[in-house]
Amino acid sequence: MASLPSYAQKLSLSTNLLDYACLGTMNADVSYSVSRRWSVMAGVRYNPFTFNEDDPQEQFQMRQQSYAVGARLWPWHTMSGWWFAGKLRYQEYNHGGILSPESEEGDRFGAGLYAGYTYMLTSHLNLEFGTGFWSGVSLYRTYSCPKCGKTIDHGRKYFLLPDDLMISLAYVF
C-alpha cells in the first residue's frame, strides 16, 4: 500500500499593523515551519519619514531600517496557538524631536525574547498578538536638535528596550 505525502502549510508572510502607527514604519516577516513545533523567521522594518522638515523647532522623526532573524517554539503546532521566540537584530536608527528637542542616531546590535498567541481566522489567514524586549549595544551620536547637527554626546551604551508590541496579520501559504 503506497502512501502519499501529506500537505502542510509551512510558509507565512505577515505584517505588524501597530508598526504603521509608529510614524508609518513599514514591516514584513517571513516564517517557515521546520518541524511540528519550530519555525524560523526573518523580518525587516523600514521608516524613511521625517516630519516638519521646514521648521527645525517642530521637526521630528523615527527613521530606521532594522533586520532580524530568529526562531519560534510552538508548544502545540506551528502557525497556531501560543509561541515563544528569540531573535538576533540589527537596527540603524535616527529618532528625535518627539519627547524632547534632542535627536539620536546610531546602530544597535542585540538579541530579544518574545511571546505571543496566533489565532487562526481562516485556513490561510492568522491574527498574531505578541510582545517582547531586546537588549544589546548601541553605537550612537546625540544632537541638540533633529536638524542643527550640533553633537552633544557620542559613544557606546548598553540598552534594554521593549520591542514588537504586535497585532499582526499573517497569510499562511
Enumerate the predicted regions with their spans.
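Cleavable N-terminal export/targeting peptides
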Residues: 1-10, 173
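Extracytoplasmic loops and strand-loop junctions of Gram-negative outer membrane beta-barrel proteins
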Residues: 10-13, 52-54, 96-99, 148-154
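Solvent-exposed loop/turn segments connecting transmembrane beta-strands
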Residues: 14-29, 47, 78
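Short secondary-structure boundary/capping segments within folded domains
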Residues: 19, 31-34, 159
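Surface-exposed strand-loop-strand hairpins of Gram-negative outer-membrane beta-barrel proteins
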Residues: 20-22, 54-62, 148-158
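A short local loop/turn or secondary-structure capping micro-motif enriched for an aromatic residue
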Residues: 22, 48-51, 136-137
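Gram-negative (and chloroplast) outer-membrane scaffold detector with strong preference
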Residues: 32-129, 168-171
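Predominantly the C-terminal beta-signal and adjacent terminal strand-loop region
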Residues: 122-173
